[in-house]
């Protein structure tokens, strides 16, 4: 069988989970050591170091891509692609406007006013890979939620390849990126982290990249914020006997083609369905240009597990906490209450994972490698800073004064207690006279 098929027995599920997590092993020590050196050098020497590394690894010094270049790139693209990008951008914008959290205020009781101000970050950097990994959809998915959130300035960095992708530059124009800078690799992340030359320090860095970029983002965290450290792509598909094997096979292959570490796993309650989907995957895969990648990723990280009950499949899905989770059953919404951990859940035969990658509106930047247990997809929330606001009248504070003093004294923080007591000391003195 093209797809390894096993019957759920406890051990089979654990093996699959273990193998999927093993794909997400951190960057090799030698990569982290190199990246640490570059980051430290840029922090110490600034622009001089950035230019040296850019000339060494990018082949030229960093430069700002002029707006006219973006306009020309937009005009050079196929009109059908521009129409698709514009439509996707509108859907992404609409979705994120629905979820945008706003400033709020609450009067709990007389004299107690509480609230929260919600503001977009001042400046955000987006890393966009070059070469074959330059995806215009990723530009839209990273930039538009930031713009909806109200980010003040959006800076995109991308390697200065011989022919910068017209599609990527057009997407930057459509998304409203403020500045595009031609610089890639660790040196780009370092410049955004510490600020150097005409590249200002940002508040947050988002976007995918290779192992060096991922290691640099990890080291940058704390000086600036980051979105997440993305691992290899993955999909789990829960399918019953009613699912169309052609559809499910195509969806599994759409993840398997990403790279040799991608994982495509089928969970079903039908051995016949598992076998049919496996055969269909092999038929379709042999017709695809990325056959060599698919063959290896499916052999290493693809499988089908047959359960007696799909609720057991849901329990496994929750442990795996996959990046993408498709539910292709007769009544997919009936399983939704049992599914808690996934980057995105796709319900039914007509919500395939590529719909989310390109067009539906929710961001396709999702937690991988089991981190959907505690991480959420990139969204407007990623680019917001929330600040608590507290306002009390004298009477309101006085009603809690002795409680606050008691709590502060129990922690031996006498200055805290005194901060409350001094506000009512004169009144107490008058009462004692």
Where are the model-predicted features located?
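Conserved small-residue-rich beta-alpha loop and adjacent elements
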Residues: 106-170
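Alpha-helix C-terminal capping segments
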Residues: 141-152, 173-175, 193-199, 217-219, ...
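Short internal beta-strands
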Residues: 152-160, 264-270, 277
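C-terminal core of ALDH-fold dehydrogenases
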Residues: 318-433
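N-terminal Rossmann-like NAD(P)+-binding subdomain of aldehyde/semialdehyde dehydrogenases
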Residues: 1-122
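A glycine- and small/hydrophobic-rich beta-loop-beta segment
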Residues: 258, 266-342
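Conserved NAD(P)+-binding/catalytic subdomain of aldehyde/semialdehyde dehydrogenases
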Residues: 176-254, 258-263
């Amino acid at each position: 069988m093209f797809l390894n098929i096993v019957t759920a027995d406890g051990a089979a599920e654990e093996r699959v989970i273990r193998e999927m997590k093993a794909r997400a092993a951190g960057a090799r020590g030698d990569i982290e050591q190199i990246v640490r050196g570059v980051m430290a050098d840029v922090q110490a020497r600034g622009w001089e170091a950035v230019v040296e590394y850019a000339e060494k690894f990018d082949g030229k010094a960093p430069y700002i891509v002029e707006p006219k270049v973006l306009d020309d790139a937009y005009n050079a693209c196929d009109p059908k692609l521009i129409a698709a990008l514009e439509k996707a951008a509108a859907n992404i914008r609409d979705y994120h406007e629905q979820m945008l959290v706003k400033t709020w205020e609450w009067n709990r009781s007389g004299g107690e006013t509480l609230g929260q101000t919600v503001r977009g970050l001042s400046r955000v950097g987006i890393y966009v890979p070059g070469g074959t990994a330059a995806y215009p959809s990723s530009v839209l998915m990273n930039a538009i939620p930031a713009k909806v959130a109200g980010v003040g300035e959006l800076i995109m960095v991308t390697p200065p390849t011989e022919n910068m992708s017209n599609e990527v530059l057009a997407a930057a124009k459509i998304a409203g990126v403020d500045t595009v800078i031609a610089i890639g690799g660790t040196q780009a992340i370092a410049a955004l982290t510490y600020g150097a030359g005409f590249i200002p320090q940002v508040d947050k860095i988002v976007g995918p990249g290779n192992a060096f970029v991922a290691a640099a983002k990890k080291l940058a965290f704390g000086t600036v914020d980051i979105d997440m450290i993305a691992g290899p792509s993955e999909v789990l598909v829960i399918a019953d006997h009613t699912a169309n094997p052609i559809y499910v096979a195509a969806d599994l292959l759409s993840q398997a083609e990403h790279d040799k570490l991608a994982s495509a796993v089928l969970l079903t309650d039908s051995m016949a369905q598992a076998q049919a989907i496996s055969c269909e995957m092999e038929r379709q895969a042999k017709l695809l240009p990325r056959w060599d990648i698919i063959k290896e990723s499916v052999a290493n990280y693809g499988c089908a597990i047959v359960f007696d009950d799909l609720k057991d499949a849901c329990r496994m899905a929750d442990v795996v906490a996959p990046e993408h989770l498709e539910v292709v059953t007769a009544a997919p919404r009936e399983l939704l209450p049992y599914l808690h951990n996934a980057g995105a859940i796709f319900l039914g035969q007509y919500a395939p994972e590529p719909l989310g990658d390109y067009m539906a509106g929710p961001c396709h930047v999702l937690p991988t490698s089991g981190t959907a247990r505690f991480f959420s997809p990139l969204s407007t929330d990623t680019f917001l800073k929330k600040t608590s606001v507290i306002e009390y009248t004298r009477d309101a504070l006085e009603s809690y004064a002795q409680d606050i003093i008691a709590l502060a004294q129990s922690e031996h923080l006498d200055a805290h207690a005194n901060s409350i007591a001094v506000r009512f000391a004169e009144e107490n003195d008058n009462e004692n006279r």
